[in-house]
């Protein structure tokens, strides 16, 4: 299983949002380059970068900073404010390995399916942020302020045959509160859709959580707050996953 240490960027600073709320920001400093370098020195191969400024306002995308982060030698998976093929091409040209597509993956499946076929399944990761409502998981939209009418399974089914290979699913109810990931959800997704590499996101608080996500069939795990709060280190996480 791949560990994706997370760096959330807001106006050049490293932050974490609690449950996606811009009025609930924890600031971890103004040196994202050093954070990325430390992840790499500890053994990380990948880094998961979210451009929160770009997500909130496409005109404020932090392209130059993301390009610099690509020069650290880490493989970069990033998103936030990606709304067009030009946005994807700009990021790929900057050295990004995989571009994350969020709300558009739910609201415009035909366009995103075309991107998957054009750029290849290994260059795009769908970000499907969900909330359980009435026993079903429904995707959230627009920075988690709206809910889609469709279900998570409906969205996944829309990409059958498109080459979709990577998707991350965040259980919004667990994001940023270190309550543990939704293991039952990831186990079901890995079982029902085995051709997709699922990334667990939201709630990871311990090495045991990483072990459980791996046992559930997740191909990757994204962790941010647990690292910044000292619950475990990147080195400990990598060793844990290697020895599991």
UniProtKB/Swiss-Prot annotation:
Its main location: cytoplasm. It is found in: Cytoplasm. HAMAP family: HisA. Pathway: Amino-acid biosynthesis; L-histidine biosynthesis; L-histidine from 5-phospho-alpha-D-ribose 1-diphosphate: step 4/9. GO terms for molecular function: 1-(5-phosphoribosyl)-5-[(5-phosphoribosylamino)methylideneamino]imidazole-4-carboxamide isomerase activity. This is 1-(5-phosphoribosyl)-5-[(5-phosphoribosylamino)methylideneamino] imidazole-4-carboxamide isomerase. The active site is at 8 (proton acceptor), 129 (proton donor). One of its GO terms (cellular component) is cytoplasm. PANTHER family: 1-(5-PHOSPHORIBOSYL)-5-[(5-PHOSPHORIBOSYLAMINO)METHYLIDENEAMINO] IMIDAZOLE-4-CARBOXAMIDE ISOMERASE. Its EC number is 5.3.1.16. It comes from Maricaulis maris (strain MCS10). Keywords: Amino-acid biosynthesis, Cytoplasm, Histidine biosynthesis, Isomerase. It catalyses: 1-(5-phospho-beta-D-ribosyl)-5-[(5-phospho-beta-D-ribosylamino)methylideneamino]imidazole-4-carboxamide = 5-[(5-phospho-1-deoxy-D-ribulos-1-ylimino)methylamino]-1-(5-phospho-beta-D-ribosyl)imidazole-4-carboxamide.
